A protein has these predicted regions:
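Asp-based, Mg2+/Mn2+-dependent phosphohydrolase catalytic module
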Residues: 1-8, 97-100, 113-223
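N-terminal start-of-chain detector that recognizes signal peptides
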Residues: 27-29, 78-80, 104-107, 135-137, ...
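N-terminal helical cap/lid subdomain that shapes the substrate entry/recognition surface
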Residues: 3-102, 115-118, 126
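Conserved SAM-binding loop
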Residues: 18, 45, 88, 106-109, ...
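Ser/Thr-glycine-rich phosphate-binding loops at phosphate-binding pockets of nucleotides
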Residues: 17, 21, 110, 171
Length: 223
């Protein structure tokens, strides 16, 4: 059995979808959690797919916004400069190069800030999109739909004609809320939202993408 959808563009999450940044994320946040006396595992369970500032506000409820912002800037610098182990995930470069070669619109839509996202993007050697949505551009981060709605708007496409590619539950929720098609990559099988997505993938190279004469894109996956 083969899954198939028609779309006109792609909206990719970055961390965990296109780029393996898990070693950096775990190092940074475990160090932060220990310095604040917070359970590191609780922090790592919370952060996936969310903006860093959201995590800090959650775990620093007794701190002022000024203190939280100062801590965010310190953590941002650590994450933007620690690039050891950053690499493109299997199939990511090949898929993006295929989209580029066929003039298929695509964007990166990340919960990361500009310094962190751009540093990891460069370190992984990914092609550069014309549209790169970061945390600074939206009022509400994932799981709210704002980032994916903005990504679709900047591509000049209706959300329902965009395929969101995500690895995080918060991002999948954001894509669904935006009204987009959704492909879930390397997501735990018990994630409830998998019942609502269009594709469930182990890696990106499971997708086949074909541009049609009418500029629609046929996306398939062998089961």
């Amino acid at each position: 059995m083969e899954a198939a959808v028609l779309c006109k563009g792609f909206l990719f999450d970055l961390d965990g979808t296109l780029v393996d940044s898990l070693p950096v994320v775990e190092r940074s946040w475990r160090c932060w959690a220990k310095s604040y006396g917070v359970d590191p595992d609780a922090v790592l369970d919370f952060i996936h797919g969310k903006q860093a500032i959201t995590t800090l506000r959650h775990f620093m409820p007794d701190k002022s916004e000024a203190e939280i912002q100062a801590e965010f800037l310190r953590l941002e610098h650590i994450e933007a400069t620690d690039l050891d182990g950053i690499r493109a995930l299997p199939g990511a470069i090949e898929l993006l190069e295929h989209l580029e070669a066929n003039a298929i619109p695509w964007a990166i839509v990340t919960s990361g800030s500009i310094p962190v996202a751009h540093a990891r993007h460069r370190a992984a050697g990914l092609p550069t999109p014309e549209v790169f949505v970061t945390a600074e551009q939206v009022k509400h981060g994932k799981p709210q739909p704002d980032a994916y709605l903005l990504g679709a708007e900047l591509l000049g496409l209706p959300p329902q004609m965009c395929l969101v590619v995500e690895d995080a539950q918060a991002g999948i929720q954001a894509g669904i809320a935006a009204g987009c098609l959704v492909a879930a990559v390397n997501v735990p099988a018990e994630t409830p939202e998998l019942l609502e997505v269009d594709f469930v993938l182990s890696t990106l190279d499971a997708l086949r993408v074909e541009k049609l004469p009418d500029n629609q894109v046929n996306v398939t996956q062998n089961a």
